[in-house]
Amino acid sequence: MKRVTVIGAGLAGSEAAWQLAKRGVQVDLYEMRPVKQTPAHHTDQFAELVCSNSLRANQLTNAVGVLKEEMRQLDSLIMKAADLASVPAGGALAVDRHDFAGYVTETLKNHPNVTVHHEELEAIPEGPTIVATGPLTSAALSESLKQFTGEDYLYFFDAAAPILDGDTIDRDKVYLKSRYDKGEAAYLNCPMTEEEFTHFHNELIKAEVVPLKEFEKEIYFEGCMPFEVLASRGPKTLLFGPMKPVGLEDPKTGKRPYAVVQLRQDNSAGTLFNLVGFQTHLKWGEQKRIIRLIPGLENAEIVRYGVMHRNTFVNSPNLLQPTYQTRTRHDLFFAGQMTGVEGYVESAASGLTAGINAARLVNEAEPVAFPKETMMGAMAHYITTTEGKNFQPMNANFGLVPGLVGQTGRMKKPEKYALLAERALEAIKDFTDM
């Protein structure tokens, strides 16, 4: 009987297990939660979203939007769950995190080809295996992986934003609007005057953070930089970043505020909201104090505080092939954020590729590397060919794919991106029947 072990039921591991199971392969899916928890998880559900509830842009003029559509073409479980659990978010795809994880969990637990083991694996097993344990891999398995790779992990710090009780937001002081009125009005906006912003910034840069351990250097991924670190770079960093007011005119005044804090719906009932871009490592008391300086949030109750955790990843250029197989053991695959792809969708996409290729391997077919013209292929190529000493995690972006042939120099970005998207989706068609 053809069997594959998948370690970790996060986004990547869940997607890999689904791709294997739907191809008739028996899957042993190991997830140590709830027997052993991580510093960032709160539930025992598969594919739990530990940071934002947003899977980012949904349009084909955005690289991650193209990646999502490629995955839909390949019957992605994660994308199906996201589409079913979506909540209003303008031009983005955001989800009710409970419904999303619940759908993934039930689908896999009820699949006849999936056997779930709630236990910790402390060493890499023999036989076809996909390691998708994520950036918070347990200490014992980390040691086993270090022995296999022969080198220490690389790492950076990741942070999550607080989530608020929607009933404690003063609706008289906030307004519903998406930036530039793109899509449906999906964000609650808290406008600030210059005086309010200056006071807020001054208090934020004085706020106490949770100290790192002595041996940990502060290395952050720019896409998930703690809010207080951004603030320390100067007030304009916030005004041109998460608090930029452009395209968010206040309907009461018809004018653009000096600064805006956006709140994104976090569940389908619309009772919870997260603060967009407010991932933080402030002490909990400080989080409450700082958030209550924001107009409309003076009495806001925090239902989940922001946290920061250390994310580890392997040196994929030295370790992996574009098929996500290891270079030295062809029946061992890695997938997810630990490979250096950064983001929910990117992690799931790597699991999709690893799952397809592990299924092909046990069925004695040659594993495939997706074309570099596709976003899935471009990411796999990037993480496996970048100069090892300069390797850092990467989001999906159009800079990873080959340029268009011909005269594109004067082409506007939306037009160029539309052509790149069309090319990618045409290229992925050859792989939809695998």
UniProtKB/Swiss-Prot annotation:
Pfam families: GIDA (PF01134). Keywords: Cytoplasm, FAD, Flavoprotein, Methyltransferase, NAD, NADP, Transferase, tRNA processing. Its cofactor is FAD. FAD binds at G8, A9, G10, L11, A12, G13. It comes from the Bacteria. Belongs to the MnmG family. TrmFO subfamily. This is Methylenetetrahydrofolate--tRNA-(uracil-5-)-methyltransferase TrmFO. It comes from Exiguobacterium sibiricum (strain DSM 17290 / CCUG 55495 / CIP 109462 / JCM 13490 / 255-15). The gene is trmFO.
